[in-house]
Each structure stands twice: as C-alpha cells, then as structure tokens.
Amino acid sequence: MTMSAEINLPFNTFTRAVATTCALIGCTLAMQSSHAGWFGATTTNSKDKLTLATWNLEWLMTPQARQALGATCMAQQPRSDQRALPCTPGRTPPPERTAADFDALARSAQALRQRDSVDVVALQEVDGPEAAKQVFRQGWRLDCFVQRQHPQKVGFAIRDGIPYRCNGDLQALDVDGGTRSGADVTLWPGTRQEVRLLAVHLKSGCFTGKLDRDFPPCAKLRQQVPVVEAWVDQRVREGVAFALLGDFNRHLDKDARYPAGPDEAAPFNLIQAWSDHNPPGAELLRATEGERYIGCDADDRHKQYIDDILIDRRLADRNANRRFARLSYEARDQGRTLSDHCPVIWSLRP
C-alpha cells in the first residue's frame, strides 16, 4: 500500500473565463459537455466537490520503451507476466509517438487539471508512472498502477495535494493470466469525504449481446463481471462511497436494458449484475446515461461510449448536481498520433 505524503487538502479554484483559458491552453481545446443541475459559476465549497475522469491512452509508453520492445515483438498478444509488444500480422502495431504527439496529449492533461479541476483520472493502457509523466507533467501524482509486466497497465493520476491510499491490485480481474487487473485507490482516507475508486480495463471484443454466447471474448468478460460485483458488494457492506471508472469495452447503454440472469456466477449482462440492490444499496448511476456521443476528433466514427464512470447511491446522494463532459482533442492536432480514446469527465457537487 502507498500513502500520499501530502496530507493537506488545497483545492484550487480555477476561473473559466475565456481570457484565462486562452492564456493557459491557447483557446483551442474543444471541450464539449451537457449539464445536469449546475452550469457555470457556483458558490459550492470546493472541498465538497469531486470531479472524476477516465482516459485510455492507447499503448502509452516512453519512446525508449517503445523502441526497445518494438525490436523484439511477439506474434501474439503477450500475457500479463510478459514484458513485450504484439506484432500480430494484419493488425496495426502499437503507436510510435513524436515529441509533438506527447505535447498534444499533455495539453489535454493540463486542461483536465487547470480548466476542469479534475481530481483524479483513471488511466488505462499506460506503461506505469514514467510513461504517464510524458502526458501528466505537472500537478499530478502518478501512482497505484497494477503490478503487471505487460505495457498495458491500469493506474491513476491524482491531483497534487489530495491524500490517498493505494489499496493493491484487484488481481482476480486477470481471469486467465492475460487480462487486466483492476487498480484500487482511496481518496481522503479517514475523512467524511472518503471515496474509494476502482479503475478497470475489461476484456475487449464483446461490446454487445448476451455474455453467454459462444464467443471467447464474451466468455472472458463474463468471468470478470462477478469479480467486480464482489468488489461492489463489499464496498456497500462497508458503507463507503465508491465509483467504478474505466474502459468497460461494452456498450453499457444497451447492456443496462437487460437482466443479469439468475446465476450471479455466470451473468448475461454487466450493469444489472452490479446494480441489483443486493445487498441493499447496491445501486449504480452511470455518467453517460442519456448523453449523446461526442467524438474525440473529426475522424471518430464511433456512435456509443465504452469509457464510463459509475457511482454508487451513497456518492450520488451527497452529490445531487452532476455534469458530464467529454474532452475532445484540438482541431490543430488532427492527424497526430494521440489515442483512440479521449477523456470522459463527471463533475459531482452537492
């Protein structure tokens, strides 16, 4: 476990005035959002707010690591205990980024901190703290990454000054030695603001349809669902506010319409398995519910979110005003090697 040495709670308030934003980021970042409950200025004490984000950074590595691993890549996807990259014939290799690419990603990270006052970002496909530093350059603690040799790791970027505790990996999510563990952190431990977060990057490939169909990715995802449910149920029993953040590799808007089925160990769908009121209080609210899809850039052809943030009833009850946003990439960076995902943000206020 890791405990932040910083025990004060300096919550900075950043103006949203256009002039200040221009000075910080050049007036080109494209923030698109839809709002529920509040918009613009507020008198809410900043200590009572919480802003969560999740961002899959698509094979984010240092240039040195990318070069070294690319020279000895494997024909198949490496397992969790293998320090290697795939070079599967017929598939696009992990990206190689230039300094300008990293700078563009860093501008998005800067906007998350300075303009949107994000407190914590759940990270996926990041090769640990050194890789994360390529993007999250100032004002963040990069920590609680899962213990995995594979370059695709899950972890957190936590705003400087927020006390936290790393709770260790949710290793059971790696159901076959090749899927990804979950990263688990507690913010403001031991205070009335305490909230526990689980960052996930679930098995890819089973985006829609029941999990019991004869398709290997669905079988793996089906094994992961009870692991998350057990984590959720334990937090409910403890009476701790919590959230799930990450890349679910699932169209949760469709998934949520259908029942989980009678067998908790072999569910048909995700959302109703986790949000089943068993134990009482096991109820989750989803950031993207009812939100139109906002593309990451002009080339984004997706229609639905797979990145999402889910909060429990306790956290929802103390934050009735919630704002969803998606941080799209700058138009001037069209064509750069950034990521096939961009940040999803959920701001919570009383």
Describe each model-derived feature in a short phrase:
Residues 101-108, 128-131, 153, 181, ...:
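Stable alpha-helical elements in mature extracytoplasmic
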Residues 120-203:
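Structured beta-strand-rich core segments of catalytic domains in phosphoester-bond hydrolases
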Residues 58, 127, 201-203, 248-251:
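Catalytic metal-binding/acid-base residues of hydrolase active sites
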Residues 35-138, 149, 332-336, 340:
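N-terminal, active-site-proximal structural segment of metallo-dependent hydrolase catalytic domains
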Residues 5-21:
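Bacterial N-terminal signal peptides that target proteins for export
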Residues 199-217:
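Active-site His/acidic residue clusters
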